[in-house]
Amino acid sequence: MRLPPTLLCVRTVLSGAMLFLIVVPGALTAQDTAKAESEKWISLFNGKNLEGWTPKIRYHDLGENFANTFRVEDGVLKVGYDGYAEFKETFGHLFYKDSFSHYRIRVEYRFVGEQAKGGPGWALRNSGIMVHGERPETMSKGQDFPASIEVQLLGGDGKTPRTTSNLCTPGTNVVMGEKLILAHCTNSKSKTFHGDEWVTAEVEVKGSEVVRHLVNGELVLEYNQPQLDDRDAHAKELIQKAGTKMLSSGSISLQSESHPVEFRKVELLDLSK
């Protein structure tokens, strides 16, 4: 059917618009690719041993890797409990040697096997990335968790929804929507990951300004003003030493909470430069 001149003009304009829409995304993709290539991610885990990392396991001295809790096998950083007769709340953390303020940390993790005997019910398929944490030297021998911001990693139980990359706050608080959050844990909006598939968790930390949680590249949680909780006795001591409750930098550590977990990548992008 022959189109009137006005409709022909409209079709020509629309065709041009469609062409624009087709071309521009390609340009953006190339730009994003160039940006990704320019990002200088460094691996915090060498795939061979625990060089650069120090264990702090409850009831044990700093540096003592009780029952070989943290080990490297087949190029994978593993957290296991085959050397435990019973867990007995022997929570542990593997600390990286340096502290950071502005950065992105990215891990690939999965839960495997069965929970250690005596592990608490809430710790089933549970681990975490601790950011803006205290240094392990300031922890007492019987201290369970470092004062820190915890990016809680959870695996599905095969039945119910169970989000991952949630927020938990041992000795800390954060602000969301201009409201101080006092609840210990806040769920993200991630999907549930059942089974033993590998999941990519990323955390973007910008000093005391903002922290963002991403799962497989999707933003699932965001908050501001990470800070020590002056209601907590140990955190109060840290506030007195630092002269402020605001957390602008701190340690990074990985948890052992009674369920075997594996990390095949632990990478960091320094945003301070």
What annotation goes with each model-predicted range?
Residues 28-273:
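Carbohydrate-interacting regions of secretory-pathway proteins
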